[in-house]
Amino acid sequence: MARKTLRARRFFSLIFPFFFITSVYAEQTPESAKTVTVEAKNETFAPQHPDQYQSWKATSEQSAREDALAEDPRLVILWAGYPFSRDYNKPRGHAYAVTDVRETLRTGAPKTAEDGPLPMACWSCKSPDVARLIQQEGEDGYFHGKWARGGPEIVNDLGCADCHNTASDDFAQGKPALTLSRPYAERAMEAIGKPFDKAGRFDQQSMVCGQCHVEYYFDGKNKAVKFPWDEGMKVENMEQYYDAIAFSDWTNSLSKTPMLKAQHPEYETWSAGIHGKNNVTCIDCHMPKVQNAEGKLYTDHKIGNPFDNFAQTCANCHTQDKASLQKVVAERKQAIHDLKIKVEDQLVHAHFEAKAAWDAGATDAEMKPILNDIRHAQWRWDLAIASHGIHMHAPEEGLRMLGSAMDKAADARTKLARLLATKGITHEIPLPDISTKEKAQKAIGLNMQQINAEKQDFLKTVVPQWEDQARKNGLLSQ
């Protein structure tokens, strides 16, 4: 695809004034940082930044829910034994961040602050209240306890104070005042040689998004968020890191494989692609400068598909028309989807074949190399498919990861065939009917009627109590 670098650089230098951007941790003295509380209520900043606020609020228009498990029931098998096998929707607007984490079946139906399956860390990318709590309680205090503990505290959707130092003079004067509001993200950027306060403005713009649009895991007894970047950001680097510390997110209930669950590694995959390598940032494509009714330029906070603002995004660098670029992107998306399905088919068979091997009396020693292949295959598949927009951000890297996943899955199945033969099993291991989400969930033993009923009761009884308490404490507008 054609890209006129000089033209793009000139455009960006004209369209984005040189803002003085700094981290809140670097800008404020320790004394002042203790006295200025993070303001999490997004509407507080509407009078100062009306265009940005209204465009952010418009993310509520991105309301459609797409059920990824219904679209592709194979996922239920790959995530058997993990909450993602219950519920996995494709992402929607930032205005639904808190609603969606409350309503997903993955967070369970806790009755008390000490109840439920997940830790506090599961709030970490959902709200500016997280930055407020980290400031008030420290990281150890924030991460302590179960997810339900944060219910009455984390109530405002992902917004202003997640990305901006809203207490700064720069922000009051209409400047972006970008900041990393999550200390663990700041440490991760330093680990890859990108300290935020020394980064250029192009890097900072993407680093802010990279606080959340990344792979991460829950570390230690406190289940604190950490990015696995100590060895690098490529899929093999992170795999090596996880293997070295013997980390797993869960054990697949069919194959008994210690698994890794990739999250949403857009920062890593963007960095590996042509846009990241040429300093085309998340902001350039997903939050372009647009004009308001008075002709004033502002950053559009209705984060979405670049094709929705083609003239302000793609057309600044590319000479092709919109239809031509859409065709290229669609072809890349289809290529990745086709290989994704092929890998999933192999992994589904591998999990059931591993179960058959266990049932036939296989030993831990016999299964260890096989499970390692399954772990590595699914990790590489997952990092590719969990990265939203990889067909645009880094299609070559996506295909490379999926190709590697296919090879690892084939290795696992070859070893399984040999092992099963030693147990007297030479026929193909039959699969149950997993043609729908419901049938796949039944095949792994999920009682979805009970799970859904418990969730509905939680939403009707517990969540209203959280919101009432938040209003009484002044955390939500009345």
From Swiss-Prot:
Record's PROSITE patterns?
Answer: MULTIHEME_CYTC (PS51008)
Q: Which InterPro entries match?
A: Cyt_c552 (IPR003321), Cyt_c_NO2Rdtase_formate-dep (IPR017570), Multihaem_cyt_sf (IPR036280)
Positions contributing to heme c 2 binding = C160, C163, H164, H301
For the ligand (heme c 5), the binding residues are H275, C314, C317, H318
Q: What are the recorded Gene Ontology BP terms?
A: anaerobic electron transport chain; nitrate assimilation
In the record, which residues are listed under signal peptide? 1-26
**Where, in this chain's numbering, is heme c 4 bound?**
C282, C285, H286, H393
Protein location:
Periplasm
Residues reported to bind heme c 3: H94, C209, C212, H213
How is the cofactor bound here?
Binds 1 Ca(2+) ion per monomer. Binds 5 heme c groups covalently per monomer.
Q: What does this protein do?
A: Catalyzes the reduction of nitrite to ammonia, consuming six electrons in the process.
Family recorded in the similarity comment = Belongs to the cytochrome c-552 family.
- Name of the featured protein: Cytochrome c-552
* Organism field: Salmonella dublin (strain CT_02021853)
